[in-house]
Design a protein with these regions (language model features):
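N-terminal amphipathic, basic-rich helices that act as targeting or association modules
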Residues: 2-3, 9-159, 188, 301-311, ...
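Long non-globular sequence segments
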Residues: 286-287, 406, 696
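Cytosolic catalytic domains that perform sulfur/thiol-centered chemistry
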Residues: 20, 30, 382, 388, ...
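Long, structured ligand/cofactor-binding scaffold of large enzymes
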Residues: 64-260, 270-275, 379-382, 395, ...
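Mobile "lid/hinge" segments at catalytic clefts and subdomain interfaces of large enzymes
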Residues: 199, 205-352, 356-357, 373, ...
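Terminal amphipathic helices with adjacent charged low-complexity linkers/tails
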Residues: 92, 110-165, 292-446, 626-691, ...
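Generic recognition of flexible, low-complexity loop/linker segments
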Residues: 19, 85, 124, 204, ...
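Short amphipathic
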Residues: 257-261, 367-375, 732, 736
Length: 752
């Protein structure tokens, strides 16, 4: 907090009179642009959705009469819930978050601008992001090795071999820019790291405090909405503009209020809830809208449950799934190791602004209100092709059987019904351990296209050190509905201790009951934070997950984005030769066909404990509500109800998952102990990048003629339009026109 009064704002600021002072619990003071003062001019502010008030604060504070004007302030302050949406809002964010796939091109652009500045004789340091930028490396690790305690180390070594050139470039960016940070590989997934570490609640500049707001280059940036931070995913151009201090322009949104009442029933998880919310909001068509959660049911939700729901805003179509700040938000900040000063400033600021607390019914004017009784939520999965297609647990087998013979146009698989139960022999040896061949590692930074294409495990050796504690049956048959990938993955669920502990408890009971997972099933645990494995280890649950094949495979997106690695050649052969409809079950957020693996047509989203359960069952054709998971000790049938953990058992272990000192110590290592693999990466130094002779990290040609034009301008002046060298785009054409339900996932390089 500021120890002395902040500098008085420029008299040119149209709303200087709204600048006021707030005081924290420790008596420290800070200044802020007060919405309650602005409400004297615009009394409707008190009934604005909380998310819109945070947007209003940004517009108010950044009102410079140029990019952001007094008219923009009035426009947002007088937001009407059912008005026509024709006006844009210039929204200036506090920071930007990037993941490595989409973040590297932005860093390339910054490097290109610095190179151009140097060529022009200008200081390259003048090219600098004007807001903090964090890049979290999470999209590069793949599950090549699985089912063994060595999997993490082996997968990370492959990751660094494949991505050395990219990582060298990122290291240059770290030392070249003052406002650019990198969270190295192996720390987690960007959205979970953002939730646990990067988010600060409020920021301050020259003594003036303002809410944490952001945009990110990943659609699931919305996870941060769970702690009351306004932010969403944008394209690279918008993110780059935000990095350089420009507003993000958005059409004034509708805000859908989502009222939650009641409480979740025993045995129902946050995953079941988010799949239900996704189904409901898809039906209400919330694309391009904000969704804001309110009501007494919302207040009852734990913070990680809120984050899980916010994470899947892209799946239900909304720009945001926003949860206002309240006492549970403050408790989460305490439990994740934020400092006392940060927490006090966060709480005092939001209370001073009238932004603290989850609204009650009737307090806010929303464009539309949707209601859900939490007591009506049941155990569910979503799939097999879309995240909004929720299926109650007891109906999964029947739904798969129904879709099996339906045409593709009806979300089916267009197979002959008579083939459903046919099984095909898997021709393989009993040995379950083969090794991934190390990829070629060329000397120097330059790589040929051929090298990049071959820089992955060969198909014939893609079977990894699988579950080596047992041997596969000599005679194994594969059929439709068989689960071949079971992955505890994705920030959506691994940020939530309740479902991770539930998975561990279920694994413990399953092992004690004598249940096993067949070794041909590719099982993996890839959480979004190291904290997960810390508390699973401390509670003694990790060894039980490992015994079922769910050994730690990496800290990153992995299976959720298609980085599941390959199946064995034998499995691929039997699937393709017989056109089988086999399945993946994962705790992710998207399940479009072939996203998880090109040969797996059915993909189901499920809670982590259900992922473990389906791995044991081995097929989605088993009704887990009424049929046994398998045979346990003494040939006894073991049912899901026999091993499902109670809410009381889960609550008893939650204390191990929210230790502030553990979070602080873990994320301190981002700077102090980033890992030997990262430390051994040799980054280029200097304020401007030295471009290698590379086909991958290459200097873009956008500024090739910039020097000539600049020289021409200095000698001849600009052209008639005052913008010599600017060229119109002419003759542009659509590259491809797709039908419904085709998304960027289908063309994304992630997992390819």
């Amino acid at each position: 907090m500021a120890k002395s009064p902040a500098t008085t704002p420029s008299p040119r600021h149209a709303f200087a009179k709204t600048l006021k002072t707030f005081t924290t619990a420790s008596g420290k003071t800070g200044q802020y642009y007060a919405l309650p003062v602005l409400a004297k001019t615009y009394p409707g502010i008190a009934r604005l959705p909380v998310a819109m008030r945070i947007v209003l604060e940004s517009v108010l504070r950044n009102c410079d009469g140029k990019k952001v004007t007094a008219d923009h302030v009035a426009q947002v302050a007088q937001w009407q819930p059912k008005a026509a949406r024709t006006e844009e809002i210039p929204f200036v964010v506090a920071r930007v978050v990037l993941q490595d796939f989409t973040g590297v091109p932005l860093l390339v652009d910054l490097a290109a601008m610095r190179s151009t500045a140097r060529k022009l004789g200008a200081n390259p340091k003048k090219i600098e992001p004007l807001v903090p930028v964090d890049l979290v490396v999470d999209h590069s690790i793949m599950v090549d090795h699985f089912g063994t305690k060595k999997a993490l180390d082996l997968n990370m070594k492959l990751e660094f071999q494949r991505n050395r050139e990219r990582y060298e470039f990122m290291k240059w960016g770290m030392q070249a820019f003052d406002t650019f940070r990198v969270v190295p590989p192996g720390f987690g997934i960007v959205h979970q790291v953002n939730l646990e570490y990067l988010a600060r609640g409020v920021y301050q500049k020259k003594g003036v405090y303002y809410p944490d707001t952001l945009v990110g280059t990943d659609s699931h940036t919305t996870m941060i909405n769970g702690i009351g931070v306004v932010g969403w995913g944008v394209g690279g151009i918008e993110a780059e503009a935000a990095m350089l201090g420009q507003p993000v322009y958005m059409l004034t949104p509708d805000v859908v209020g989502f009222e939650m009442t009641g409480r979740l029933r025993e045995g129902v998880t946050a995953t079941d809830l988010v799949l239900t919310v996704t189904e409901i909001l898809r039906q209400h068509k919330v694309v391009g809208k904000f969704v804001e959660f309110f009501g007494e049911g919302t207040r009852s939700l734990a913070l990680p449950d809120r984050a899980t729901i916010a994470n899947m805003a892209p799946e239900y179509g909304a720009t945001m799934g926003f949860f206002p700040v309240d006492e549970k938000t403050i408790d989460y900040f305490k439990g994740t190791g934020r400092t006392k000063a940060e927490i006090e400033a966060f709480e005092a600021y939001f209370k001073a602004q009238g932004l603290f607390g989850v609204p009650n019914a009737g307090e806010i004017d929303y464009s539309q209100v949707v209601k859900l009784d939490l007591g009506s939520v049941t155990p569910s999965l979503a799939g097999p092709k879309r995240p909004q297609d929720r299926i109650e647990l007891g109906k999964v087998a029947g739904q798969f059987e129904s879709l099996f013979s339906k045409p593709n146009a009806e979300n089916g698989f267009n197979q002959a019904a008579t083939k459903l139960l046919t099984r095909y022999p898997l021709h393989r040896t009993e040995v379950t351990a083969t090794t991934v061949a190390p990829p070629p590692v060329p000397e120097g930074a330059a790589r040929t296209v051929s090298e990049m294409e071959s820089n992955k495990p060969r198909l014939e050796t893609a079977r990894t050190n699988a579950v080596t504690h047992t041997k596969a049956p000599a005679a194994l048959a594969i059929g439709n509905g068989d689960v071949l990938i079971a992955a505890i993955t994705s920030c959506t669920n691994t940020s939530n201790p309740s479902v991770l502990l539930a998975a561990g408890l279920l694994a413990k009971k399953a092992v004690e009951a004598g249940l096993k997972v067949q070794p041909h099933i590719k099982t993996s645990l890839a959480p979004g934070s190291r904290i997960v494995t810390e508390y699973l280890t401390e509670t003694g649950l990790l060894p039980y997950l490992e015994k079922l094949g769910f050994a730690l495979a990496g800290y990153g997106c992995t299976t959720c984005i298609g980085n599941a690695g390959d199946l064995t050649p034998e499995l691929n052969e039997v699937i393709t030769q017989n056109d089988l409809v086999c399945a993946a079950v994962l705790s992710g957020n998207r399940n479009f066909e072939a996203r998880i693996h090109p040969n797996l047509k059915a993909n189901f989203l499920a809670s982590p404990p259900l992922v473990v359960a389906y791995a044991i069952a081995g097929t989605v054709l088993t009704d887990l509500m009424t049929e046994p998971l398998g045979k346990g000790k003494g040939g006894k049938d073991v049912y899901l109800g026999d091993i499902w953990p109670s809410s009381e058992e889960i609550r008893a272990l939650l204390k191990y998952a929210m230790k502030g000192k553990a979070f602080a110590a873990n994320y301190a290592k981002v700077k102090t102990e980033p890992g030997k693999l990262w430390e051994h990466i040799k980054g280029v130094t200097g304020t401007a990048y030295t471009w290698p002779a590379s086909t991958y990290i290459a200097e873009p040609p956008f500024f090739d003629t910039f020097v000539i034009q600049a020289e021409a301008n200095s000698k001849e002046g600009t052209g008639g339009n005052g913008q010599k060298g600017m060229q119109s785009v002419q003759g542009a054409r659509i590259m491809a026109l797709f039908g419904d339900s085709i998304t960027t996932d289908h063309i994304s390089p992630a997992g390819s």
